[in-house]
Amino acid sequence: MQNFKELGISDNTVQSLESMGFKEPTPIQKDSIPYALQGIDILGQAQTGTGKTGAFGIPLIEKVVGKQGVQSLILAPTRELAMQVAEQLREFSRGQGVQVVTVFGGMPIERQIKALKKGPQIVVGTPGRVIDHLNRRTLKTDGIHTLILDEADEMMNMGFIDDMRFIMDKIPAVQRQTMLFSATMPKAIQALVQQFMKSPKIIKTMNNEMSDPQIEEFYTIVKELEKFDTFTNFLDVHQPELAIVFGRTKRRVDELTSALISKGYKAEGLHGDITQAKRLEVLKKFKNDQINILVATDVAARGLDISGVSHVYNFDIPQDTESYTHRIGRTGRAGKEGIAVTFVNPIEMDYIRQIEDANGRKMSALRPPHRKEVLQAREDDIKEKVENWMSKESESRLKRISTELLNEYNDVDLVAALLQELIEANDEVEVQLTFEKPLSRKGRNGKPSGSRNRNSKRGNPKFDSKSKRSKGYSSKKKSTKKFDRKEKSSGGSRPMKGRTFADHQK
């Protein structure tokens, strides 16, 4: 395996890379860096998490060190990805005087104009805000020699294809080296390559997200009215460390987030209407384990690079294979195992088959957890919490109440009653989600058929998960047991069973 120095990287940059823990280049870095240093156009097909930022960022640092003015422009689909790329570039170039500026919407443009006037060597931005600066002439292109399009297919999916053309057309082709990276190569991206790139070197890497055996993929068949309860039952049984939940619409994300919070789960939501300050706050909470469930739309989650995600739940099935690929690619990274579960209405099974055919592998059918499994998981969780609570000092007033109760009731019955209330507390909470119509069946041409997706004049009614619960699941179970007042010693406490987890593959 070649090291970075053997690829032609300077000692200063190698030192920065080693301080970041990067000793050897990843496959895409090894294949891309030599051509990038020569100024050759590069067309890279790679997923997030393969080291593609280093593939274009490391040679870029080598080309701009010691020079002044904007020399490189990097386009990214989202604000989060733009910030992540910029931060990595700053780390790559530590101590070498390279200035990196980010420009994106949701932040004051005046502050960005001020930063651009200082003549940074590298600008990273989203297409819309970059065009704003081009039109204002606050971003000059005459000195730009390198243009990089990161996650080009995502920018296309978000409707930026014309913006990408506009920006590429503004940078003089004679002096421009173009590097385009994309997980997939749809026709629109291929046309962009043909129009604006000069005999690019094509580099492909192993499709980490689609072929990674570390991701176990499942689907579970569930009707819309039963979906939320089935989902929370999976959460109770799986006990995810960090989970990303995908909803199809902003409304779905808002309602699902509120419903989860009301049930006691640590969740936050992300979608396109969330302010930049709120987005940063939510992501910080997720990365710092203050919350463990992130509910998001496809657009809001694009460009996020969060490690440690153990589970991905497609609460709403994605409408195309590419979205599915990007969704499940948030888990199973860095050699860790991941689980992806897709909830599918019976009439949406054509979409599951389409995804399986495109990816060349089958998903495993996963039955919803039984009530017994859910209760066992909740009991295990409560036992662990109680053990943690016992290590903390209780307030004196609570000790007084405890003494009074223990004097009045049998201790085992008292603890059992309290545990039952804790375990079944979620069943008492009512939540409402707007009914979402399932996707249309696929026709013979692979496109939706019939009129299932036509807008109903009556709108989308709301359903109450308490009254419309899954068959066999009670929404409200109150204990009818009356515990006896204490007359005799209980003879000691009853031993609890050890912690067991239901097998998600049963």
From Swiss-Prot:
InterPro entries: DEAD/DEAH_box_helicase_dom, DEAD_box_RNA_helicases, DEAD_helicase_CshA, Helicase_ATP-bd, Helicase_C-like, P-loop_NTPase, RNA-helicase_DEAD-box_CS, RNA_helicase_DEAD_Q_motif
Motif (DEAD box): 150-153
Keyword ATP-binding tagged: yes
Superkingdom of source: Bacteria
One CC-aspect GO term: ribosome
Summary of the function given for this chain in its UniProt record: DEAD-box RNA helicase possibly involved in RNA degradation. Unwinds dsRNA in both 5'- and 3'-directions, has RNA-dependent ATPase activity.
Name by which UniProt lists this protein: DEAD-box ATP-dependent RNA helicase CshA
Taxonomic placement: Bacteria, Bacillati, Bacillota, Bacilli, Bacillales
